[in-house]
Amino acid sequence: VMYTAGSLAMAYGYDYEKAMIAGLLHDCAKCLPTEKKISLCEKNDILVSKVERENPGLLHAKAGMVLAEEAYGVKDPQILHAIKVHTTGEPDMNTLDKIIYIADYIEPLRCEAPHLSIIRQIAFSDLNQCMAEILYDTLHYLSGRKGSVDPTTQLTYQFYEPYGKDQPWKH
């Protein structure tokens, strides 16, 4: 993800060092036990929603933001925010937020996401369209699974949906 984020940053004229730091640390809390993730969030007054308690894998982003600051000394608010929103997204994300969200989805080791080759191409031409296509695929994937979808992801899709294009898989 780090190198993909750096490549996207260069393509869009963004600070590639910031992007690479965020890409490197975006999953820094992923392997923590669920209770530790919850504890990190609660100690730092970060809301843990019912959906996050039901799907604790989502919590690594919020906990990762805290860990990046406390354990790795990251102070840049844009880097910390990009780590925080890289799983659910949020409406009207800034450039770094979108770069990390997208890099996490298109990184070279990912191979099972639907429409990945097309989405990888879009990533280097239009961040907003790429967000729309990733969120569309993500919500369709999650709708076929047991469990609830984070409302923030739904709101994020509603924000980016107008940027999406009519793709063959949407029919």
Spans of model-derived segments:
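Divalent metal-dependent catalytic cores for phosphoryl transfer on phosphate-bearing substrates
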Residues: 6, 11-133
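Charged phosphate-binding loop/patch that engages nucleotide di/tri-phosphates or the phosphate backbone
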Residues: 140-171
